[in-house]
UniProtKB/Swiss-Prot annotation:
InterPro entries in UniProt: Somatostatin, Somatostatin/Cortistatin_C
Propeptide residue interval(s): 25-88
Signal peptide: 1-24
Source organism per UniProt: Protopterus annectens (African lungfish)
UniProt family annotation: Belongs to the somatostatin family.
Name of the featured protein: Somatostatin-1
Disulphide bridges, residue numbers: C104-C115
CC annotations in GO: extracellular space
Pfam families: Somatostatin
Amino acid sequence: MLSCRFQCALVLLSLAVVFSKVSAAPSDLRLRQLLQRSLAAAAGKQELTKYSLAELLSELAQSENDALDSSDLSRGADQDEVRLELDRSANSSPLAARERKAGCKNFFWKTFTSC
């Protein structure tokens, strides 16, 4: 009798183990699917991050180019004004070259001599 009860308990225990493994198999599959989905989502986020980074860099480069273009235009206008002022100062000499003193035309090492 004792052996019969022991055999029945052993059979019930083995059946419980088999059913637990069978019921655990789909959860492993579910876990694998969940893991694959999360990895795919992470890869999608990484691609999105790369896209966002590329988009950000292109916008930054575009704004930098726009700023450089506008500063080039303002520099060009400033240079035109400077050239105009230099032309005025060169043309507005009150005395002709003959009327200047001889010492004022001579220069030594980038400086004019005293007149």
